[in-house]
UniProtKB/Swiss-Prot annotation:
It comes from Homo sapiens (Human). GO terms for cellular component: cytosol; extracellular exosome; glutamatergic synapse; nucleoplasm; plasma membrane; semaphorin receptor complex. Glycans are attached at residues 77, 660, 672, 701, 1043, 1187, 1212. It is found in: Cell membrane. It is a single-pass type I membrane protein. Changing residue 1185 to Q: Found in a patient with an autosomal dominant neurodevelopmental disorder; uncertain significance. Residues 1-26 form the signal peptide. The chain crosses the membrane at residues 1245-1265. It is linked to Dworschak-Punetha neurodevelopmental syndrome: An autosomal recessive disorder characterized by global developmental delay, mildly impaired intellectual development, speech delay, and behavioral abnormalities including autism spectrum disorder and hyperactivity. Additional variable additional features include optic disk hypoplasia, ptosis, hypo- or hyperpigmented skin lesions, non-specific facial dysmorphism, and abnormalities of the ventricles or corpus callosum seen on brain imaging. The lineage of its organism: Eukaryota, Metazoa, Chordata, Craniata, Vertebrata. The gene is PLXNA1. This is Plexin-A1. Disulfide bonds join 95-104, 130-138, 286-407, 302-358, 376-395, 515-532, 521-563, 524-541, 535-547, 598-617.
């Protein structure tokens, strides 16, 4: 049947609801702990975007949420109504203005837009949402639907701040006066150092029209003042990290307040790399102060129990409740401020968990501020705003009257408070960390809600009058979102029913109260929740307004004392009673006239009657009670309720008891209970009704009347003996007719006995004659439980549990002594004749002496026996406690007191350790005088007659213990080392004590050869004597000492990480590690502690396996986590148990996927196995990686590891094999591998292959025969080549060895010469000029300048301008902005400025730092890689940096680095000159440069020439080594070097000015020249003359004489002059002028005459030469081995230089301050710009010092020394310089066969040099920072030393030439700059320009 339309609609609606319901609660939070069945909280979740801000509309209750890239509108119950997208946007933080306004040179990327400010503008019905994108622009959204009304973004006022931190900005929206419409926005924001772009605090206009051009314009702005406050750039340059973070803002009366966090500039050091301190400030402004004259800020915080809380987290402005207002002495409409502070002043981003909730009154804050303003206007103190420039300005006295409403003047502002405004601490949370706060007044009581880091809301009641002295009580804690911190915007709903709490991903609606969870009045009112009271008749905990008729008396309880109290009479009834009348009395109940019922829980209910204020009702019937009490023992407690007929609710209860007497089975338990029970002793029952007892005398009500057995003497019964047992009793009943008599029950295990008993009277009873027995002889006496019954099963009470003791005499008493020492109450004695223990009547004794009993005082046993001695050896000195075990060793101590001897030595028994008959312990006396070394032990019982004397079966030996060794012989000072002391007889005696260094060594065990003990802590390092006391013997050995060493320390663990399963190898570096034999590493994590052993290699190194931290509770996250504790168990060294210094991390174990779903993977042979997974490479710092082993079966495979997979080259296996992966302690099997062998071929295939193979074989044989013939020829060639290669290798090695030895000798001679003459350092002035102005010998700054007086005055004024930092910076920046300002100009200006400021080095350093800071900023803003910074000289700053180091490192060069540099230069020069050098090409036999290597064999001989001393012809001739292939000029150079050894180059003759004269006798003298008529010419090639050409012989005498002018020279001089310029242009390279000169060939070819000059090799550019000399050149690359030989020869000198440069302290010189200072500056800049890439920092330092200074000096030693550098030396130094640069680089050098030879040459050395550089940079970083005072003093000293080196007037004149050239641009720049205008810099410069113009 079809459904009607209406039904169909209803059905569809129901279905829709069913579908929606699950979704409505899908993302709900958790109910509170301890809660009842309350439904979960409503939530809104944002999975994609982090939430940041939340506001609630005060009329509609709608919720607006700001997030990353989104704005959401939610209903009051958190249903999503609208979402508005704000991002991501294409942006770059460096783009100012944003890309939407102006194209940006920086790369754009997808950028999140973080909502930082969310405010409701009720008057304009819009939402103001400000984000982080596009420099912090804001959007206006319509409240109804989030429609975007406007987004002002085109003016600078629209950009609030680009900082991305969400919780750092705060604003207050001030509505305009009614009718005028214009509102104001006060906004505070951090600026991230961009003070030129953003004010930190400002007041903006909010226009009615969102597109209005004046939107966000400053409320007031003129030329000097505006509604804004900026952080000065000087503050930021001193404290780059300085910023102000705005936590909370509010309006109170006519003021706007901000709570801020800012860097504490007084506690934070400007150069501190890490430690930043913060302080909280409260900032106040007048609402109507557009000029911000009213700005005041005060430190704010609170203190509790001596702990300071200074980091503000959140605040909330509220009104106090009536009670709190009264306690504070305030009116109820005054404002109070609740704040949350974290402890201390560190870690703004992650503050400590310990936090405090504090209370401030606005009245007190205003009063403090007023007092401060008044004191300042009285002229007291300073402005004291630490972060403003005018903080040191004094206050100005003024007669103004300062009242509460004062809003400031244009002086005495802005003002800072010096005293902290302290709040009242209300509540301290030490565990969870408070993060947010909100508060409100509920019915006159103040309730505070505090959010925590763990996602909870704490509800706190504030009551300053608490009797316990606690001003606040946290009465409840509920979870909003577990584990996620509550963010700042904690907001109440308009009706105060709910609290909206926000975490990063969720908004939760938390009810302000959850009274319904409390189920009783006591719980409800005991919770102290001020919202909750007890609604009496409804029996529910609720708000007052939720309780019906709550205002009527006693219907609503608001206090614990008002809870309903109920009593009942009687309080109990027997289960057998029915309908007992009960009277109930109730207190604190309302009017019950509507009627009540009595309800016994849910069992029964009865009507009640109200009479005289009492309630009367009846108990249930016995039939109804029976099921209630069944199985409940003797009582059942039930709740008796009063149930209101009005509400149907049970509203009061009292405990009521039903008791049951009949369960008691004994008289005593019956009458001793809590209830009125009676015992019927004749019926043996317990009843509540006394009438149930038939006999009156049988009724018992008290325990004294109960029948019971009384304690009498103990009952001892020998087994097998018939005897009666009499018992004492009380109130024994006389059995009545028909009742049976008494019996005794003995509960003997295995054979219980029932014996008839006779009742004598009511107090006496006898168990009749009977014998008793028990099985076995292993028990000598057996206590047996005894019961007395009558009438079959009526048990008489035995309250004392009286027992009978059965005993057997022979059991366990085989000897006389054991028999007689038995308890005398056992009638056992020793039957002498039968030699057994028995009862007397069982012994056939004919005399009394035949049976002995202990009661006979003189009894003693015969035949004592010694069975065992312990110990069996002891020292002669005595004192050994000898334990003698045996039989019949006396019965009393007196029997043996004097009867024990060891041989002749008395042994004194110790009474306390004597065991009758069985054991004697005695102390042996001194046996020193006894010669015998062993003796028998004798025991005499009373006397030594034969029957009473015992001798030991073994002899006791007297020994002399000794020791001769201790192992280990050393250990830590803290002790705890197990040592073994070796010797002989060390187990002697009964007691041993060892002391080491006078302190006891804790004994463990010993044997005859060793004692083990644990060393005590030592007093100090060094040897400690060992003393062993064995009883009275004291053993010493002066040769054996134990050495205490300093405790081991741990310096480093490498790597500083492991995985969850541990097991990875850790190299531990420290000191004194070998002092501990078995060190162990320990780790504690998640409550579980584990240890692993370590292997010690030496005192500084050991290797440990990391302990596993695997546990079920906790595992490390992917980014790693520190263990709770990590340390080392090293004997007793406590300091290493927990290492605080290490940052050791544990990463999760690798996770590998199974090989396949089934676990079995099939694989072909030789196919790689790929194992996929994650966490395979932990993201640990450093180069260490996790080492994997993959086993196929038991065979390992070759592995390649990446982040997500292991690639395993499977071994050559077939079949099934288990795959196992191991890494450290981690082991996992991803499955089994099935490897198939290649499939077998079919028969036809085999036949086919066989036929084809045979044919192929014939072909192969033919080919092989042909190949064999060819290969025989090739073999011969190969062997010949191999022989040549071997010879070549041997030759290179030998050549290198010989050359080095020879060079060392030469250098040694040179060093000796230097010791006398000294290194020819240039003076400071020349050195500086060569670096600053290379190639200019006679620079104007070296000369005095003659000028007119007015010019001098102008230049002086210009000099003063240059010392104004702002002018100089503007000057430099303006020049650099000009296109015509060339690179050369930049270098020139930098050098001129440094010379002009030579006497102002501190100022110059400040300017340089600012320029470098700008350069870094510019570099980072451009697309250049940060590593390119300082790489090239493209700015004034870079050249200034070179000059700065030039000035400051001169002393270091002279004292330290100069010597190895000069030695390297000399070594290169000497080594080069040992072999031929081509005078034309500059190529040499020995070279480091491939380009300057002669690549063919040159035959030459070494000659020794005896040179006549040019200064004194009569002095001895100087022997000089030369080569016969040297040109005449080369020979002259060598002769001059020898003759003028030690003379600076500039002070000796030049080769061109001297002639070489060969003297062959007294008169025969020949002038030798490079070219003369004898010069050989061949096919247009003219060869220079050499010594061989002139046939100069070894030992020839030569002289250097002043140049003679000859006809030949005259004729050729013009040719030389003309050819010079052209040839120079061919060979010059870009270098310093001196090096240009040095690269000019020594002889210039005559190009005009058509002939070409050559010396050793013809120029490679000529083809005829290339073909013709092929034979002599062979393969030219073979000669590259000479590079290697030369490099090996010079290696030591290169190493020495590099080591000196890269050492922080060398040759007595400390590291120059300039280096440390500049490196620290670069680190600060990197920190400022958040550059954490170590490579970038390294590169900056390398570009700054090695590249800019050292490379220049290495390539150009003539800058430092007075020397001449020739072409080949220059080429070699360039190779060294390149190696130096490569060593400073961080990039990997990938080398191949095509790499340049100079790179290959030092390829193996560079990694080592790189490690030196890294260590050098690290050592510098570790050095303490240089204080500003020390640096200032150092720079002042440098200025003083070199004050007059340059003419400053000349330098100023040179600089002024640039002013002339760019006058207009510089003046315009000064006019544009605000600070320049303030300092009137333009007018001052114009004055200089005018004066200079007049003079010209």
């Amino acid at each position: 049947m079809p459904l009607p339309p209406r039904s169909l609609q209803v059905l569809l609606l129901l279905l829709l609801l069913l579908l929606l319901l699950p979704g409505m609660w899908a993302e709900a939070g958790l109910p509170r702990a301890g809660g009842g069945s309350q439904p979960p909280f409503r939530t809104f979740s944002a999975s994609d975007w982090g939430l940041t801000h939340l506001v609630v509309h005060e009329q509609t209750g709608e919720v607006y949420v700001g997030a990353v890239n989104r704005i959401y509108k939610l209903s009051g119950n958190l249903t999503l109504l609208r979402a508005h997208v704000t991002g991501p946007v294409e942006d770059n933080e460096k783009c100012y203005p944003p890309p939407s306004v102006q194209s940006c040179p920086h790369g754009l990327g997808s950028t999140d837009n973080v909502n930082k400010l969310l405010l409701l503008d009720y008057a304009a019905n819009r939402l103001l949402a400000c984000g982080s994108a596009s420099q912090g622009i804001c959007q206006f959204l319509r409240l109804d639907d989030l429609f975007k009304l406007g987004e002002p973004h085109h003016r600078k006022e629209h950009y609030l701040s680009s900082v991305q931190e969400a919780g750092s900005m705060a604003g207050v929206l001030i509505a305009g006066p009614p009718g005028q419409g214009q509102a104001k926005l006060f906004v505070g924001t951090p600026i991230d150092g961009k003070s030129e772009y953003f004010p930190t605090l400002s007041s903006r206009r909010l226009m009615a029209n969102e597109e209005d051009a004046d939107m966000f314009g400053f409320v007031y702005q003129d030329e000097f003042v505006s509604s804004q406050l900026k952080i000065p750039s000087d503050t930021l340059s001193k404290f780059p990290a300085f910023d102000i973070y705005y936590v909370y803002s509010f309006r109170s009366e006519q003021f706007v307040y901000y709570l801020t966090l800012q860097l504490d500039t007084q506690l934070t050091s400007p150069d501190a790399a890490g430690e930043h301190f913060f302080t909280s400030k409260i900032v106040r402004l007048c609402v109507d102060d557009p000029k911000f004259y009213s700005y005041v800020e005060f430190p704010i915080g609170c203190e509790q129990a001596g702990v300071e809380y200074r980091l503000v987290q959140d605040a909330y402005l509220s009104r106090p409740g009536r009670a709190l207002a009264h306690q504070l002495g305030l009116a109820e409409d005054e404002d109070v401020l609740f704040t949350v502070f974290a402890q201390g002043q560190k870690n703004r981003v992650k503050p400590p968990k310990e936090s405090a909730l504090c209370l401030f009154t606005l009245r007190a804050i205003k009063e403090k501020i007023k007092e401060r303003i008044q004191s300042c206007y009285r002229g007291e103190g300073k402005l004291s705003l630490p972060w403003l420039l005018n903080k040191e300005l004094g206050c100005i006295n003024s007669p103004l009257q300062i009242d509460d409403d004062f809003c400031g003047q244009d002086f005495n502002q802005p003002l800072g408070g010096t005293v902290t405004i302290e709040g009242t601490p209300l509540f301290v949370d030490k565990d969870d960390g408070l993060t947010a706060v909100a508060a409100y007044d509920y019915r006159g009581r103040t309730v505070v809600f505090a959010g925590t880091r763990s996602g909870r809301i704490r509800k706190i009641l504030v009551d300053l009058s608490n009797p316990g002295g606690r001003p606040a009580l946290a009465y409840e804690s509920v979870v909003a979102q577990e584990g996620s911190p509550i963010l700042r915007d904690l907001v109440l709903s308009p009706n105060h029913q709910y609290l909206y709490a926000m975490t990063e991903k969720q908004v939760t609606r938390v009810p302000v109260e959850s009274c319904v969870q409390y189920t009783s009045c006591e719980l409800c009112l005991g919770s102290r929740d001020p919202h909750c009271g007890w609604c009496v008749l409804h029996s529910i905990c609720s708000r007052r307004d939720a309780c019906e008729r709550a205002d009527e008396p006693q219907r609503f309880a608001a206090d614990l004392l008002q809870c309903v109290q109920l009593t009942v009479q009687p309080r109990n009834v027997s289960v057998t009673m029915s309908q007992v009348p009960l009277v109930l009395q109730a207190w604190n109940v309302p009017d019950l006239s509507a009627g009540v019922n009595c309800s016994f829980e849910d069992f029964t209910e009865s009507e009640s009657v109200l009479e005289d204020g009492r309630i009367h009702c009846r108990s249930p019937s016995a039939r109804e009670v029976a099921p209630i009490t069944r199985g409940q023992g003797d009582q059942r407690v039930v709740k008796l309720y009063l149930k209101s007929k009005e509400t149907g609710k049970k509203f009061a209860s009292v405990d009521f008891v039903f008791y049951n007497c009949s369960v008691h089975q004994s008289c005593l338990s019956c009458v001793n209970g809590s209830f009125p029970c009676h015992w019927c002793k004749y019926r043996h029952v317990c009843t509540h009704n006394v009438a149930d007892c038939a006999f009156l005398e049988g009724r018992v009500n008290v325990s004294e009347d109960c029948p019971q057995i009384l304690p009498s003497t103990q009952i001892y019964v020998p087994v097998g003996v018939v005897k009666p047992i009499t018992l004492a009793a009380r109130n024994l009943p006389q059995p009545q007719s028909g009742q049976r008599g008494y019996e005794c029950l003995f509960h003997i295990p295995g054979s219980p006995a029932r014996v008839t008993a006779l009742r004598f009277n009511s107090s006496s009873l006898q168990c009749q004659n009977s014998s008793y027995s028990y099985e076995g002889n292993d028990v000598s006496d057996l206590p047996v439980n005894l019961s007395v019954v009558w009438n079959g099963n009526f048990v008489i009470d035995n309250p004392q549990n009286i027992q009978a003791h059965l005993y057997k005499c022979p059991a366990l008493r085989e000897s006389c002594g054991l028999c007689l020492k038995a308890d005398p109450r056992f009638e056992c004695g020793w039957c002498v004749a039968e030699r057994r223990c028995s009862l007397r009547h069982h012994c056939a004794a004919d005399t009394p002496a035949s049976w002995m009993h202990a009661r006979h005082g003189s009894s003693r046993c015969t035949d004592p026996k010694i069975l065992k001695l312990s110990p069996e050896t002891g020292p002669r000195q005595g004192g050994t406690r000898l334990t003698i075990t045996g039989e019949n060793l006396g019965l009393r101590f007196e029997d043996v007191r004097l009867g024990v001897r060891v041989g002749k030595v008395l042994c004194s028994p110790v009474e306390s350790e004597y065991i009758s008959a069985e054991q004697i312990v005695c102390e042996i006396g001194d046996a020193s005088s006894v010669r015998a070394h062993d003796a028998l032990v004798e025991v005499c019982v009373r006397d030594c007659s034969p029957h009473y004397r015992a001798l030991s079966p073994k002899r006791f030996t007297f020994v002399t213990p000794t020791f001769y060794r201790v192992s280990p012989s050393r250990g830590p000072l803290s002790g705890g080392t197990w040592i073994g002391i070796e010797g002989s007889h060390l187990n002697a005696g009964s007691d041993v004590a060892v002391s080491v260094g006078g302190r006891p060594c804790s004994f463990s065990w010993r044997n005859s050869r060793e004692i083990r003990c644990l060393t005590p802590p030592g007093q100090s390092p060094g040897s400690a004597p060992i003393i062993i006391n064995i009883n009275r013997a004291q053993l010493t050995n002066p040769e054996v000492k134990y050495n205490y060493t300093e405790d081991p320390t741990i310096l480093r663990i490498d790597p500083e990480w492991s995985i969850n399963s541990g097991g990875t190898l850790l190299t531990v570096t420290g000191t004194n590690l070998a002092t501990v034999r078995e060190p162990r590493i320990r780790a504690k994590y998640g409550g579980i502690e584990r240890e692993n052993g370590c292997l010690v290699y030496n005192d500084t190194t050991m290797v440990c396996r990391a302990p596993s931290v695997a546990n079920p509770v906790r595992s490390p996250p992917e980014l790693g986590e520190r263990p709770d504790e990590l340390g080392f168990v090293m004997d007793n060294v406590r300091s290493l148990l927990v290492l605080n210094s290490t940052s050791f991390l544990y990463y999760p174990d690798p996770v590998l996927e199974p090989l396949s779903p089934t676990g079995l993977l099939e694989l072909k042979p030789s196919s790689p196995l790929i194992l996929k997974g994650r966490n395979l490479l932990p993201p640990a710092p450093g180069n260490s990686r996790l080492n994997y082993t993959v086993l196929i079966g038991s065979t390992p495979c070759t592995l390649t590891v990446s982040e997500t997979q292991l690639l395993c080259e499977a071994p050559n296996l077939t079949g099934q094999h288990k795959v196992t992966v191991r890494a450290g302690g981690f082991e996992f099997s991803p499955g089994t591998l099935q490897v198939y062998s290649d499939s077998l071929l079919t028969l036809p295939a085999i036949v086919g292959i066989g036929g084809g193979g045979g044919l192929l074989l014939l072909v192969i044989v033919a080919v092989l025969i042909a190949y064999k013939r060819k290969s025989r020829d090739a073999d011969r060639t190969l062997k010949r080549l191999q022989l040549q290669m071997d010879n070549l290798e041997s030759r290179v090695a030998l050549e290198c060895k010989e050359a080095f030895a020879e060079l060392q000798t030469d250098i040694h001679e040179l060093t000796n010469d230097l010791d006398g003459a000294g290194i020819p350092f240039l003076d400071y002035r020349t050195y500086a000029m060569r670096v600053l102005f290379p190639g200019i010998e006679d620079h104007p700054v070296l000369k005095e300048m003659e000028v007119q007086a007015n010019v001098e005055k102008s230049l002086t004024l210009f000099g003063q301008l240059l010392t104004k930092k702002h002018f100089l910076l503007t000057f430099i920046r303006t020049l650099e902005a000009q296109r015509s300002f060339s690179m050369r100009d930049r270098g020139n200006v930098a050098s001129l400025i440094m010379t002009a400021l030579q006497g102002e080095m501190e100022y110059a350093t400040g300017v340089l730092k600012q320029l470098l800071s700008d350069l870094i900023e510019k570099n980072l803003e451009s697309k250049n890689h940060p590593k390119l910074l300082l790489r090239r000289t493209e700015s004034v700053a870079e050249k200034m940096l070179t000059n700065w180091f030039t000035f400051l490192l001169y002393k270091f060069l002279k004292e330290c680095a100069g010597e190895p540099l000069f030695m390297l230069y000399c070594a290169i020069k000497q080594q080069m000159e040992k072999g031929p050098i081509d005078a034309i090409t500059g190529e040499a036999r020995y070279s480091l440069s491939e380009d300057k290597l002669i690549r063919q064999q040159i035959d030459y001989k070494t000659l020794t020439l005896n040179c006549v001393n040019p200064e004194n012809e009569n002095a001895p001739e100087v022997p000089v080594k030369g080569l016969d292939c040297d040109t005449v000029t080369q020979a002259k150079e060598k002769l001059l070097d020898a003759a003028y050894k030690g003379v600076p180059y500039s002070q000796r003759p030049k080769a061109a000015d001297m002639d070489l004269e060969w003297r062959q006798g007294r008169m025969a003298r020949i002038i030798l020249q490079d070219e003369d008529v004898t010069t050989k010419i061949d096919n247009d090639w003219k060869r220079l003359n050499t010594l061989a050409h002139y046939q100069v012989t070894d030992g020839s005498s030569v002289a250097l004489v002043p140049k003679q002018t000859s006809a030949y020279n005259i004729s050729n001089s013009s040719t030389f002059t003309k050819s010079l310029s052209r040839y120079e242009s061919m060979l010059r390279t870009a270098s310093s002028p001196d090096s240009l000169r040095s690269r000019t060939p020594m002889i210039t070819p005559d190009l005009e005459s058509g002939t070409k000059l050559w010396h050793l090799v013809k120029n490679h550019d000529h083809l005829d030469q290339r073909e013709g000399d092929r034979g002599s050149k062979m393969v030219s690359e073979i000669y590259l081995t000479r590079l290697l030989a030369t490099k090996g020869t010079l290696q030591k000198f290169v190493d020495d230089l590099f080591e000196t440069i890269f050492s922080t302290a060398h040759r007595g010189s400390a590291l120059p301050l300039a280096i440390k200072y500049m490196f620290d500056f670069l680190d600060e800049q990197a920190d400022k710009h958040q550059i954490h890439d170590a490579d970038v920092r390294h590169t900056w330092k390398s570009n700054c010092l090695p590249l800019r200074f050292w490379v220049n000096v290495i390539k150009n030693p003539q800058f430092v020394f007075d020397i001449h550098k020739n072409s080949i030396t220059d080429a070699c130094l360039s190779v060294v310089a390149q190696t130096f640069m490569d060593s400073c680089s961080t990039s990997e050098h990938k080398l191949g066969k095509d790499s340049p030879s100079n790179k290959l040459l030092y390829a193996k050395d560079i990694p080592n040099y790189k490690s030196w550089v890294e260590r050098y940079y690290a050592d510098i970083a570790k050095m303490p920072a240089i204080s500003d005072q020390d640096m200032s003093a150092y720079l002042a000293e440098q200025s003083r030393l070199h004050l007059s080196q340059f003419n400053s007037m000349s330098a100023l004149h040179e600089i002024y030439s640039y002013i002339t050239k760019y006058k207009d641009e510089i003046l315009a720049a000064l006019e544009k700059d605000e600070q320049a205008r303030r300092q009137r810099l333009r007018s001052k410069l114009e004055q200089v320009v005018d004066t200079m113009a007049l003079s010209s």
